Structure formats: C-alpha cells, structure tokens
UniProtKB/Swiss-Prot annotation:
It comes from Maricaulis maris (strain MCS10) (Caulobacter maris). The keyword RNA-binding applies. One of its GO terms (biological process) is translation. Part of the 50S ribosomal subunit. Contacts protein L20. This is Large ribosomal subunit protein bL21. Keywords: Ribonucleoprotein, Ribosomal protein, RNA-binding, rRNA-binding. Residues 133-147 have a biased composition (Basic and acidic residues). Belongs to the bacterial ribosomal protein bL21 family. This protein binds to 23S rRNA in the presence of protein L20. One of its GO terms (molecular function) is rRNA binding. Residues 110-149 are annotated as: Disordered. It comes from the Bacteria. GO terms for cellular component: cytoplasm; ribonucleoprotein complex; ribosome.
Amino acid sequence: MFAVIKTGGKQYRVAAGDEIRIEKLEGAAGDTLDLGDVLMLGSEAGVTVGSPTIDGAQVIGELLDTNRARKIIVFKKRRRQNYRRTKGHRQWGTVVRIAEIVAPGEKAKTALKSTTAEPKAADAPKAKAKAAPKAEKAAAPKAEKAPAKKAAAPKAAAADALTELTGVGPALATKLNEAGITTFAQVAAWTEADLDALSETITGLKAKAEKNDWINAAKALAK
C-alpha cells in the first residue's frame, strides 16, 4: 500500500518503511507522529482519491532526526551599482520513517507518542510551587514602602529634515516618521536586520538606502 501525503506545503508519495526528509516538525528522536493530510491511497484493490483529503486515513511516521540540510549560496548582484551580496542558507528539516499507513475504518497498530511533551507538563506545577513563596516574601515589603514618584518622561529628540538624504522626498520622509525614524542618528545606526524590517512596511526602502548610502550620509549629517 502507498499513500500521498501533504505536510509543510509539499506532497510526498510514501510506503511503509520509507525514509523521507520533510519540513521541520516539533519533536524528539523516537517520537511517532501523524504526518498530515492524506490525499490519496493506493493498494491492490485500487486507488482512492480524497476531496481534497481522505477522512479517516492516517500516515504514521517515526521521527529519526532533525537537522539542517547542506548550505545553499544566495548571490545577488546589480549591474553598474557596485552591489554584490553573498549569503548562505541551511534549511531545517526532519527525517522520518513511515511506520504505518492506516486506511479509513481500520485501527492504527502504532500509537502516537511524544517524548518531549509529557515532561514539560509535569515540570510546570513544580516550577510554579517553588516560585510562589518568593513572590509572597517579596510582596510584603513593597506594600510598606511609599509609592515611588513617577520619573519625568525623557524629552523627545528634535526631528531632523530627512529629506536632506538623497532619494528621500516628503512622502517617504512622512512614512519614515510614522515608523518612528525622525533623526539622522537613527538612520546612521541602522543594521541589516533593521532595513529588512522596515522594508516590510515601506516597499523598496532597503534598496534605496543601499543605493544612496544613507547610513554613511546620515552619520555625516548627524555630526
């Protein structure tokens, strides 16, 4: 018997005893897991196709290992702009062995188990019980103390004219201000992660910042 399953956005044709690598699943080696939606079942009696899945069908796999695949090199280049970026990426994945394929109406012989979930649940009450006495001891002195005066709010830094940066017009400056970027010092302190985060809300920001060298320009203007 074989089955076609869907897990992690991909489809796999599997049979009992097969070892496959799929997108990362939570669990430890030795766990038995339900491997997602069953789209099709095939046997000597014929083929059953789901619409889109087969109710009652199940594919059970044993988790063997969770590791990262070989490194993939991602190279980006822009002509006539002296722009080159080389990055590596290793995708996490899980290796599983197909333990059993269960057809609708049949009872699974392999029980689902997780070696990581049960200990965490058992340890939680102990941690709470230990933390409770400390909380009670600390609560009493705080009640006796006079209420602390609220600290004065720090004065907001004066906003800079971000339009002095090449490629920043009034509309883009407004978007940056709405995102909390109001000074050259903030622009000068940008990191690669900051640019990626801002590009999610302001389209094309990272490309403009790198093309016009905003970070170095902001450092000069912030002095």
